[in-house]
Amino acid sequence: MERLKDNIYYCVSSLPYWRTPWGNQINGTDGSWFPPLINKDLQSERLYLFSTDICRSLYAKFERHSSVLNIPTESFSIPAEVFLNSTLNPDNIAFGTADSGVLDVSVCRQGAPIYISLPHLLYAADQ
């Protein structure tokens, strides 16, 4: 099971982009598979993903049980706190000072002014 936590991203185990060692960690899978037997009944259970598009790890939380063609499924979603600014979520201090709902990824995109958000600026600040 520990093998599922091993990560390789261009042969490195951490990133050089973010402000803290925690922010530079590579945690989780690419999102196409996860460890079996996830405890979906705990609110604190987090499913960690690493996204090469945003150059960081993030997590999803269990949302609900459902089914597709009578096959049981579970839905997970990225919670709002993942993209809150560091004033509202101090855990995000590593990822800069952009407004809530967006992530400035220019540090890992050769300085190009690129900001990432959830679809349709979900959870973004009003301004």
Named regions from a protein language model:
Residues 1-72, 78-127:
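Extracellular or lumenal secretory-pathway regions
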